[in-house]
Amino acid sequence: MAGAKEIRSKIASVQNTQKITKAMEMVAASKMRKSQDRMASSRPYADTMRKVIGHLANGNLEYKHPYLEERDVKRVGYLVVSTDRGLCGGLNINLFKKLLADMKVWSDKGVQSDIAMIGSKGVSFFNSVGGNIVAQVTGMGDNPSLSELIGPVKVMLQAYDEGRLDRLYVVSNKFINTMSQVPTLTQLLPLPASEDQELKQKAWDYLYEPDPKPLLDTLLRRYVESQVYQGVVENLASEQAARMVAMKAATDNGGSLIKELQLVYNKARQASITQELTEIVGGASAV
């Protein structure tokens, strides 16, 4: 059994670690609330854009934009939103598993994949397991802006425009609540038709001023950008929630470990005192 001094040192070490994890839990909780506010403020715009695009996809348009037309799929692209930091449980690995599963489905059909990665954890993971990363952005911090995302989005849209990609997805974690974050894979291009039954039963006609082409060119790009940005802010809220839960679990585990070490320490003290008493009694008997 370890000596009392060694056990006291272990207890002190665990207590110091526990203070760190508790502080990280509180910081993550504060950042999560801010991320939730940012997510809530951007969600109405993203949802409205999704509805407008759903109308367009179901509509009888005089100008058929390339983003609305289905193609034979020979190559797919993924805009993947991961985190820059760890200590957030299985948030990233669950997302990567979902992505790899979808990539395998396409690979079995002879379709290749390109990845535009957001977040350093995703870059590290796919550099190690293998993946064709064509664009990346890292270090966006806790307050990401749309301008920081333009690079990867532009690369993928250009590839789609030039026919080098036939389908484009955004992959990110959807924030449900503090305890639940769900990895999601959403098709961006070609634009999926709305699942709203009311829209499917109606024929939509549109009048454009002055001309449909420049309007749709701008609107559809804004749609893609808005969905990627929404994925980033939701993933950030998911990251902070997962980190808060992970740090709380670490703090609680530290408390349990301290109790176990305290019990071992008490037994060691008891054994030490018993041994000293035995030596004293033995010495007295010898006299």
UniProtKB/Swiss-Prot annotation:
GO terms for cellular component: plasma membrane; proton-transporting ATP synthase complex. F-type ATPases have 2 components, CF(1) - the catalytic core - and CF(0) - the membrane proton channel. CF(1) has five subunits: alpha(3), beta(3), gamma(1), delta(1), epsilon(1). CF(0) has three main subunits: a, b and c. CDD domains: F1-ATPase_gamma. The keyword Membrane applies. PANTHER family: ATP SYNTHASE GAMMA CHAIN, ATP SYNTHASE SUBUNIT GAMMA, MITOCHONDRIAL. This is ATP synthase gamma chain. It is a peripheral membrane protein. It is found in: Cell inner membrane. The keyword Protease does not apply. The gene is atpG. InterPro entries: ATP_synth_F1_ATPase_gsu, ATP_synth_F1_gsu, ATP_synth_F1_gsu_CS. The lineage of its organism: Bacteria, Pseudomonadati, Pseudomonadota, Gammaproteobacteria, Enterobacterales. Produces ATP from ADP in the presence of a proton gradient across the membrane. The gamma chain is believed to be important in regulating ATPase activity and the flow of protons through the CF(0) complex. Transmembrane segments: none annotated. It holds the Pfam family ATP-synt. Belongs to the ATPase gamma chain family. GO terms for biological process: proton motive force-driven plasma membrane ATP synthesis. Keywords: ATP synthesis, Cell inner membrane, Cell membrane, CF(1), Hydrogen ion transport, Ion transport, Membrane, Transport. GO terms for molecular function: ATP binding; proton-transporting ATP synthase activity, rotational mechanism.
